[in-house]
Amino acid sequence: MSQALTLARPYARAAFAIACEKGKCMQWSQALTFSAQVANNPIAAALLCHPQIDHEQAAALLSPEGADPAYVRFLEVIAEAHRLDVLLQVAGLYEKLRAEAEHVIKAKITSAIELAPNELNNIVTALKKRFDCEIEVTTGVDHSLIGGAVIDTGNVVIDGSIKSKLTRLQASLTH
């Protein structure tokens, strides 16, 4: 996985630089998401690896309808370098670069029960204050947490679950 990220990083940076230069960051984001999904389809992946498919045809197959010509050329470069297998990682890294540039942090909030809208708003407000940027939230429910919540922003994990508190208490009692 880390090798795929290492290979994908320069492509993601190049895509982000080109998209920003053209003022089309969101369009490229959507196009990369589409292309990564197509490339990850086993049938499409087999077709893309076929020796009779050249890099221009591969780029055409992966491009969404009406894609920016520079985006299509970007896909041609990746196909020519035989790196279509890291397109999913390119898309993920591109999204991170876009979020950083837009001062947005993506947070995953997992709680023992579904959070009420006002509870979720309170958490988002606290996260905005702590990180001084906008927060995009996805939520999930994990009953094994017993109570509380776990907030994962990618770089920071805030674990306020009862499960982790009980685990820490157990560890302190056994040592």
Curated annotation (Swiss-Prot):
Gene3D superfamilies: N-terminal domain of the delta subunit of the F1F0-ATP synthase. Pfam families: OSCP. One of its GO terms (molecular function) is proton-transporting ATP synthase activity, rotational mechanism. Keywords: ATP synthesis, Cell inner membrane, Cell membrane, CF(1), Hydrogen ion transport, Ion transport, Membrane, Transport. The keyword Membrane applies. It is found in: Cell inner membrane. Transmembrane segments: none annotated. It is a peripheral membrane protein. The keyword Metal-binding does not apply. One of its GO terms (cellular component) is plasma membrane. F(1)F(0) ATP synthase produces ATP from ADP in the presence of a proton or sodium gradient. F-type ATPases consist of two structural domains, F(1) containing the extramembraneous catalytic core and F(0) containing the membrane proton channel, linked together by a central stalk and a peripheral stalk. During catalysis, ATP synthesis in the catalytic domain of F(1) is coupled via a rotary mechanism of the central stalk subunits to proton translocation. Belongs to the ATPase delta chain family. F-type ATPases have 2 components, F(1) - the catalytic core - and F(0) - the membrane proton channel. F(1) has five subunits: alpha(3), beta(3), gamma(1), delta(1), epsilon(1). F(0) has three main subunits: a(1), b(2) and c(10-14). The alpha and beta chains form an alternating ring which encloses part of the gamma chain. F(1) is attached to F(0) by a central stalk formed by the gamma and epsilon chains, while a peripheral stalk is formed by the delta and b chains. This is ATP synthase subunit delta. It comes from Xylella fastidiosa (strain 9a5c). The lineage of its organism: Bacteria, Pseudomonadati, Pseudomonadota, Gammaproteobacteria, Lysobacterales.
